[in-house]
């Protein structure tokens, strides 16, 4: 599979599976996406619109954001997504949002946390309390992070949902705070809810694979200390988020979302080296542990991701070779301190 343009990439990301189309046909009510302006939100909204259209049902998708990125609001509206431009932390504005049956909560702050901890905690932990109360009668899929888990031994298969959280650093702590506050709302109001613990969605414009490919292509050193990772194609991650609306429950269900492999960064870099005709440069040796998730429960519910690791590697190498667009949003996936 080769992607030659942003338009082809957006088309791939927004192509629904037959299973998603069927579930959108059965799902009752409209969909509200809070925090639609991030890396994943626009393609999730477009995926929802396409699935609804192909299902032949009448359902609105509304995206909520400050829309600070020029052109995004108009782009989404042109696709059929209704938009509402507000600051979610402004409670008066939050209360003006329409009541809907289905909410996908994507709002959050990660990068720039160090030195702005108060802002991160407000967005990641205070706001969920206000949202949980406002939408207590809705189904809610809450985007969270695999960062809430402890580092796991490389041979462990990663942390599954039964592993106790042990967040490192204030970002991860605030993410666990978000989960706990939404769980409180679920208990208090009997709100059906799913906590969606994602680690490392990628498309060709951002993510771990792009960063490794760029380092190989540019001859930069690759630090192998955090030498293993998980990834999942953003289109698959978005599809799982939408399909998770149908399994929200009380008390809140927890679901790890990532690909099936524990991936060696050394191996990935060497594969990029072959495809880009470059010799990867490595420093340090692999630690015995890393931030790894086990998404076996997710795969049992929804099947394996449609886009494979090998396809992601080949598409990313081609994208880098042709000088494809980058969002210039580093993931800092090699960070072990928990500081972002």
Task: Label the predicted regions.
Residues 2-24, 309-340:
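Amphipathic terminal alpha-helices
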Residues 30-50:
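N-terminal Rossmann NAD(P)H-binding glycine-rich loop of SDR-like oxidoreductase domains
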Residues 176-230, 234-236, 272:
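NAD(P)-dependent short-chain dehydrogenase/reductase
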